[in-house]
Amino acid sequence: MIVLEDAEPFDEVRRDFAVEAVELGIPFHITLLFPFTPREQLTAGLLAELRAFFAARRGFEFELARVAEWPGVVYAVPEPDTALRDCMQALFLRFPQWPPYGGVHPEVIPHATLGEEVDAPSVRAEIERRLAGHLPRRYKVDAGTLLEEFARREWRVRERFPFAG
């Protein structure tokens, strides 16, 4: 994942509309590949592969430009998303045993979830109101992050993988 630092007021919105993710300790982010290997199957070799993968990539920038929705989900749209899509696709190709979102979605679209399991149209309007004046927000990406479920319903950062530069 790409952890999005300096996340206020996004975290305030998430506390109201993405309650479960916040309670689980999942930071504001853009998913690169999920699900990934279970914690008990995460080996030193696999971590080394991830380090090498991210170390071979260059950092990039994007803006969270606007708010959009899917049924039940409200999210911030990163633009441009080409570097994110390239990184996601390269991870998918490198680790085909873990298809993105279990292979449920034919196309994986980069996004930063702001609300889930919600009435998307009404929640989107409320989130847009609350984020007025805060979008677009520019982000510089210099690392990928591996999050792991270390206890039932508790997540934490396992490792941060710096990009080449």
What are these regions (language model features)?
Residues 1-61, 81-143, 155-165:
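Basic, often amphipathic N-terminal segments
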Residues 64:
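Portal/gating segments that form or line small-molecule/metal binding sites
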